[in-house]
Structure formats: C-alpha cells, structure tokens
C-alpha cells in the first residue's frame, strides 16, 4: 500500500546475507575452473559485464536519482566492488580458496572492530579473530602460501571494507537497485582490462554460458541480496556476520575439492560460527531496526 511502512523481521536480512555468501562461494569455485581458459582478469570481465547487464535489465537504474551527497560514496562503492572482484580472482590463482577468503575477511573484520561500541560487540569480534587465526595454516604450511597472492587477498579485503562503508550510504535510498549503478561503474574500469588480457577467447560461445553462471552466482544475486542486508543491519553486525565467509569456503573445499580439516580448524570454524550467532542475538538490543517502504 503506497506510503505504508512495515518493520521487517530481524532474521530476514540475516537469512538474505547467508544466501548471498553461499552463492558467492559457489560462483568462486566455478570461476576458478575457468582460469586456465581466460585467466583471472578475463573471468572478472565476464562476471562484471554479464552481471551488470542482468542488474541493469532488472533494476532499470536510469530511473534512479541520487542526491549530491550520495554520488561520491556511489563512485567509491562501484570502484571498491570492481577492485574486490579483480584482486580476489588474482589471489586465488596462487592461493587456496579458503585461505584467500580468510585473508580477504580482514576488511569486514576491521569494519566490525572499529564500529564496536559495547563490550559484548567486542567479544564477538575477538571470537571471530581467534577463529580466523586458527583457520589459517600458520606455521609450517604458511611457507607454502604465495606471498603475492596473500597480499592481493588482503588488498581485496581493503576493498571489501570500503564496499561495506560506502554501500550503506550509497544504497540508503534505493537499496538493491544501487548495485546496478555500482556494478556499471566497476565494469567500465575492469571489463576492458580483462578483455585485453584474455583476448578473443573471452567471448567464445563455449565460455559465455559458464561466464553467465558466474555472473549470476557471484554478482547479480549476491550483491543484490547484500545491499538488502547492508541497509538493514548495523555496520558491526554485518561485518561480524561476514565471518561465515571463510568458514563456508573451507567447508566447500572439503566437500567439493577433497580438502581435509584438522581438529583445530574445526574448532576454529565453530568459533567463527559462534561469533556470527552471538552478533545475531545482540541485534535485538539495537535502538532501531531500519524500516522500509512497502510499495
């Protein structure tokens, strides 16, 4: 009903975020299988080009009007979205998926840490940090991790932090439709880079269907869902809930790639999940939950 408002259930944006993270992990596995054919920059170009077309067709962003104070955050939102994709795909060329995701998570973890105000919030962040610490193959195995790939994953994490902070401001009015504009900004910068490096193979008929699947799983679906969660969850809660990402990556590697987990790593996953659950349970103590118009 026009002009009416309804308070969304607290659990709904959390469920939306979990679906988005699962979709991204599925897309990352598929994307990595395309690296031998078109390279990481080429997959980035496919993901952004096809994903942007889907988002534009669905959200029709030319109808949106952004206030002057939203334009700069929107620009940085789009640039960080593209940089996050590009650097992450470069990193998983040489770094295992689970490790790359864990290193990339330093971005949202930093957002959660610096946004914490109450002791209980800090507890969940510390618990997530401990989980990530033991999840990473520190010690003997760490010598086998490519340092350049690890640095690229950390760079992707920095872009992720900017994505979270600017996404909340840029999407405050238009919600998930903002993703279409942000993705277009990212595509303008990073699609030409990937297209030049991949060459004609990028647009081969056998590659395009797989690229479309990557675009849907890794861009169109999850970023739309994440924007819903971004504009309806506190910053620290969103950042801490994203700690599920490396846990999902590790479990995905175990199921689909045959990777085994040690007892300590299993405990680390439990710590990360506990941090996410704790953060979720404390949402109800927030003064307000964002309301949305139901048109």
From Swiss-Prot:
Residues 1-7, 60-71, 115-118, 168-175, 222-237, 284-295 are cytoplasmic. It holds the Pfam family EamA. Residues 30-135, 159-278 form the EamA domain. Keywords: Amino-acid transport, Cell inner membrane, Cell membrane, Membrane, Repeat, Transmembrane, Transmembrane helix, Transport. InterPro entries: AA-Vitamin_Transporters (IPR050638), EamA_dom (IPR000620). It is a multi-pass membrane protein. Residues 29-38, 93, 140-146, 197-200, 259-262 are periplasmic. Involved in the efflux of threonine and homoserine. This is Threonine/homoserine exporter RhtA. It comes from Salmonella typhimurium (strain LT2 / SGSC1412 / ATCC 700720). Its main location: membrane. NCBIfam families: PRK10532.1 (NF007823). The chain crosses the membrane at residues 8-28, 39-59, 72-92, 94-114, 119-139, 147-167, 176-196, 201-221, 238-258, 263-283. One of its GO terms (cellular component) is plasma membrane. One of its GO terms (molecular function) is threonine efflux transmembrane transporter activity. The lineage of its organism: Bacteria, Pseudomonadati, Pseudomonadota, Gammaproteobacteria, Enterobacterales. It is found in: Cell inner membrane. The keyword Cell inner membrane applies. The gene is rhtA. Belongs to the drug/metabolite transporter (DMT) superfamily. 10 TMS drug/metabolite exporter (DME) (TC 2.A.7.3) family.
């Amino acid at each position: 009903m026009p002009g009416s408002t309804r308070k969304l259930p607290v659990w709904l944006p959390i469920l939306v975020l979990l679906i988005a993270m699962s979709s991204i992990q599925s897309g990352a596995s598929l994307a990595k299988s395309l690296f031998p054919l078109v390279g990481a920059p080429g997959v980035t170009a496919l993901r952004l080009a096809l994903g942007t077309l889907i988002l534009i067709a669905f959200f029709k962003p030319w109808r949106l009007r952004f206030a002057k104070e939203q334009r700069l955050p929107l620009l940085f939102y789009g640039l960080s979205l593209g940089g996050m994709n590009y650097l992450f795909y470069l990193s998983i060329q040489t770094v295992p998926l689970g490790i790359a995701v864990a290193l990339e998570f330093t971005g949202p973890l930093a957002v959660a840490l610096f946004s914490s105000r109450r002791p209980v919030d800090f507890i969940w962040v510390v618990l997530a940090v401990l989980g990530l610490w033991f999840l990473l193959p520190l010690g003997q195995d760490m010598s086998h991790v490519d340092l350049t790939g690890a640095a690229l994953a950390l760079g992707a994490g920095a872009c992720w932090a900017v994505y979270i902070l600017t996404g909340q401001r840029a999407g405050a009015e238009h919600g998930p439709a903002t993703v279409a504009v942000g993705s277009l900004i990212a595509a303008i910068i990073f699609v030409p880079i990937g297209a030049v490096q991949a060459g004609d193979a990028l647009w081969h008929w056998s590659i395009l269907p797989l690229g479309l699947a990557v675009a849907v799983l890794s861009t169109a679906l999850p970023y739309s869902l994440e924007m819903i969660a971004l504009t309806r969850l506190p910053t620290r809660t969103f950042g801490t809930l994203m700690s599920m990402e490396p846990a999902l990556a590790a479990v995905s590697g175990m199921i689909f790639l045959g990777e085994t987990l040690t007892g300590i790593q299993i405990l680390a996953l439990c710590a990360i999940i506990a941090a996410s659950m704790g953060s979720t349970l404390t949402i109800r103590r927030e003064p307000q939950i964002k309301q949305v118009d139901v048109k």
